């Protein structure tokens, strides 16, 4: 049996405390003296680096090039687009003074970079021959959140923001959908998180967007988490910042824009979808250590170190971690469970005699005796099966938790059971707010699929199937 770590609260006891104890015990985040400003420890940063590396590859396949924008934005620039500043004004961090000198014109620390990209695009686009332009940056942004939680709501968080301009509405809107597909494939195939794709309601759109496409994931407590978004911005920002190009007709036209983003919030989803009461469960593609080699009393038997070295040579194309300390094997295994290592290989005197090792799967806790000579053949199959199992479990949980409802009473019952609801809905923002007061759930997205039905709240005919859930 692996050593039980007393500091981990169980999900049944308190889900929020469980989440925090996982974050702390897995050495993901360290708090600082500034509210919401957190240290992303090496374990968390390794996950983020793996996410960055894979998404960057996918973006480049679609002609996206990286750049870096400044951190500060003149506040006067926000005034050009009133709706946008209304969306972010309460969250802005401001720079009002440099040294002893107070500024006549304040700067905002970027909460997002539409304004910076707009000014950049304005200066580099001239004619239709320059289009499309597709750029992305990996950076941190700052928003003064009232309530902060690691990964879910940081005052400073890391993300990528992709911005692109096109000659036509169809091109910009189509590319927004392409990027949403990139996110969907990545989150499902690499993070093993099943998602629901859809369109945000008008009142849930990104400030300034004509359409916001989203992927929503379900956490183990039944709440939804918006995992990534892609927006068709139309000509809203183009007109505010005068981004024009000369078309083939020799006339000047405003560009059409899109933007998209995925942040370190997705690490919070990774925890709340897969982790258990022993710690993280990381999909093999994203795990900072894919395999841990744990020797049992190697300080008393140096031969075990030679076996460990042989194993490392066999498996050198994986991310490996070795622990040859004199800590008990129960403690070593428990630590790897907390950190979500997909496979642990135990090497002891007994195994040495039989020229075998014991493999422990993180997802099922199953122990398997394997001949040393078979390791190279068995490990890739095991990792593939772990990945499949993690995804299938999460997918079944999601599918079992979506319930179709016909009226507000049914919605109340479903949400009270920590599930999500699917319903025909053609109401207003005010209707949505009233529904939230009654049920604690709100609209998350409108499904891609369309059917004819009757709105469960207004009784109007509609073809909009909508997801309702409590949400982070």
UniProtKB/Swiss-Prot annotation:
> What's the EC number here?
6.1.1.15
Biological process annotations from GO? prolyl-tRNA aminoacylation
Q: Spell out the Pfam families in the cross-references.
A: HGTP_anticodon, ProRS-C_1, tRNA-synt_2b
Task: Identify the PROSITE patterns for this entry.
Answer: AA_TRNA_LIGASE_II
Q: Which UniProt keywords apply?
A: Aminoacyl-tRNA synthetase, ATP-binding, Cytoplasm, Ligase, Nucleotide-binding, Protein biosynthesis
Catalyzed chemical reaction(s) = tRNA(Pro) + L-proline + ATP = L-prolyl-tRNA(Pro) + AMP + diphosphate
Family matches, as Gene3D superfamilies? Anticodon-binding domain, Bira Bifunctional Protein, Domain 2, C-terminal domain of ProRS
| Functional note | Catalyzes the attachment of proline to tRNA(Pro) in a two-step reaction: proline is first activated by ATP to form Pro-AMP and then transferred to the acceptor end of tRNA(Pro).
Q: Which family does it belong to?
A: Belongs to the class-II aminoacyl-tRNA synthetase family. ProS type 3 subfamily.
| Subunit structure comment from the entry | Homodimer.
Name of the protein in question: Proline--tRNA ligase
Native species: Ureaplasma parvum serovar 3 (strain ATCC 700970)
> Which gene name belongs to this protein?
proS
């Amino acid at each position: 049996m692996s050593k039980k770590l007393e500091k981990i609260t169980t999900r049944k006891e308190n889900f929020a405390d469980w989440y925090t104890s996982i974050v702390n015990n897995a050495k993901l985040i360290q708090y600082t003296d500034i509210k919401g400003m957190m240290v992303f420890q090496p374990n968390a940063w390794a996950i983020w680096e793996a996410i960055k590396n894979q998404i960057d590859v996918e973006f480049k396949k679609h002609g996206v090039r990286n750049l870096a924008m400044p951190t500060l934005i003149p506040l006067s620039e926000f005034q050009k687009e009133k709706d946008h500043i209304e969306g972010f004004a309460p969250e802005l961090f401001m720079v009002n003074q440099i040294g002893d000198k107070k500024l006549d014109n304040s700067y905002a620390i970027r909460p997002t970079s539409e304004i910076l990209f707009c000014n950049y695009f304005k200066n580099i686009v001239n004619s239709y021959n320059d289009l499309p332009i597709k750029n992305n940056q990996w950076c941190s942004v700052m928003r003064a959140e009232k309530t902060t939680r690691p990964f879910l709501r940081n005052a400073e968080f890391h993300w990528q923001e992709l911005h692109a301009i096109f000659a036509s509405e169809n091109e910009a809107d189509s590319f927004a959908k392409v990027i949403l597909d990139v996110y969907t494939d990545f989150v499902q195939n690499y993070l093993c998180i099943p998602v629901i794709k859809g369109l945000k309601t008008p009142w849930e759109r990104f400030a300034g967007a004509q359409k916001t496409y989203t992927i929503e994931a379900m956490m183990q407590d039944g709440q939804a988490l918006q995992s990534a978004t892609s927006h068709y911005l139309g000509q809203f920002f183009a007109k505010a910042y005068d981004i024009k190009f000369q078309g083939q007709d020799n006339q000047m036209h405003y560009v059409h824009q899109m933007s998209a983003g995925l942040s370190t919030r997705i690490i919070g989803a990774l925890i709340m979808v897969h982790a258990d009461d022993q710690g993280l469960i990381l999909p093999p593609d994203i795990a900072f250590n894919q395999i841990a080699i744990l020797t049992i009393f190697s300080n008393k038997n140096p031969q075990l170190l030679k076996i460990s070295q042989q194993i490392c040579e066999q498996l050198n194309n994986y991310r490996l971690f070795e622990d040859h300390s004199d800590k008990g094997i129960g403690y070593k295994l428990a630590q790897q469970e907390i950190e979500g290592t997909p496979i642990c290989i135990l090497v002891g005197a007994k195994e040495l005699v039989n020229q075998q090792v014991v493999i422990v799967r993180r997802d099922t806790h199953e122990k398997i005796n394997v001949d040393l000579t078979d390791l190279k053949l068995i490990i890739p199959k095991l990792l593939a099966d772990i990945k499949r199992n993690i995804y299938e479990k999460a997918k079944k949980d999601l599918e079992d938790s979506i319930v179709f409802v016909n009226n507000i009473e049914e919605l109340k019952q479903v949400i009270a059971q920590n599930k999500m609801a699917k319903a025909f809905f053609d109401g207003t923002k005010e209707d949505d707010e009233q529904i939230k007061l009654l049920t604690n759930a709100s609209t998350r997205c409108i499904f891609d699929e369309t059917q004819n039905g009757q709105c469960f709240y207004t009784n109007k005919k509609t073809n909009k199937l909508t997801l309702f859930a409590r949400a982070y």
